Amino acid sequence: MYKLNSITENKLIENITKNYNRSPIQINNLQESDSELLNINILENDQLAITTDSIVEEIEMGIYKDPYLIGWMTVMVNMSDLAAVSATPVGVLVSEILPENLDESFRTKLHEGINDACKECGTYVIGGDTNFGKQLIISATAIGITKNRMFNTRIGCKPGDVLYTTGKLGIGNAYALTQLAESECQIEYKPVAKLKAGIAIWGIASCCIDTSDGAIAAFDQLMRLNNVGIKMDLDWAAKLDTNSKSIIYEFGLPKWLLLAGQHGEFELIFSVPSEKESILKKISSQLSLHFLRIGEIQNNKGFFLNINDHQVELPTEKIRNIASQKNFNLNTYLKPLLEIDNSLQNNKRQYFDNLLTSL
């Protein structure tokens, strides 16, 4: 009698998947079909939501070193995309290239992270692919369902709409900073996709995006897609994660850099027409969700916030494009950002000089 696990590859896949919870809608067992077969009851007005993402740069740059976190984030980056469109997850497909000399304990922790993240989000690994190569590369594709055309997109915000976030911002960039600088300062980083909030805000939010690439990238993308500007509330810094502000202070860096970096905290940023704010507050109370107001949409193009009691416009295009430079390292990344900060400070001094002259 043949045994599937007498083949090395089959045995490896069995060992990898044995601790995963099995989806109740999955038809085939392990190895039984070329594609995973699911019993999905799709109604006429329901939609499939599909997204895919890889964990590559974070591993190569040393932001993610812990195998458990790598596994956790492989799932969460995709779940966050589903949350942004108000989808309920069906499952994830995980594709991984493993170095042949990879320590078994590393591999075990990697898949513990994947499995725990799925449990946290109420979903399942429903399939995938495992291969071997020179370096670790891992990605996942997530599938979700939205009901009765109840989905959010990045399009729809209008001047006068109010901006909210599902939680405090900045922890993603603070964590990346500590890892890239190999700092003794430590901050816990284990984001959870805001699936519950994403569904709750449907019908209230006029647009929605996640902060997977950092808050400024999200704000800038909304401005470009909707041809609007954004003005942050005066107390925007109060909406930054407290421990992250301590980290940025230790490094002697301006607080707005917690918004600027492109390693996010996986919150949702969404806009709400002002007449629907009372509904949002009611839902927030009923579902024990904590939405934070952070700004408003305006006609005046640009991204404006208050720094040291003076309103400035951040050059979001320049800030985003800095991250695309070749041969990335922390110093070459921070230098142009600090040059921007210095320019903002000079503009502020010039403003007050002109004000004094006019008196």
Predicted regions and their residues:
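Small-aliphatic-rich amphipathic alpha-helix that forms the alpha element of a beta-alpha
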Residues: 67-91, 112-120, 196, 200-203, ...
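Glycine-rich anion/phosphate-binding loops
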Residues: 29, 62-77, 101-112
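Helix N-cap motif at beta-to-alpha junctions
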Residues: 271-277
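Beta-strand->loop->alpha-helix junctions that form or flank phosphate-binding loops
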Residues: 27-32, 131, 212, 228-240, ...
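Acidic, Ser/Thr/Pro-rich beta/coil linker or hinge segments at domain junctions
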Residues: 3-4, 8, 237, 284-359
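Active-site-proximal betaalpha loop/short-helix elements
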Residues: 99-101, 189-264, 304
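N-terminal glycine-rich anion-binding loops that anchor highly charged ligand groups
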Residues: 30, 35-58, 83-88
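Glycine-rich anion-binding loops of enzyme active sites
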Residues: 48, 55, 88-177, 296
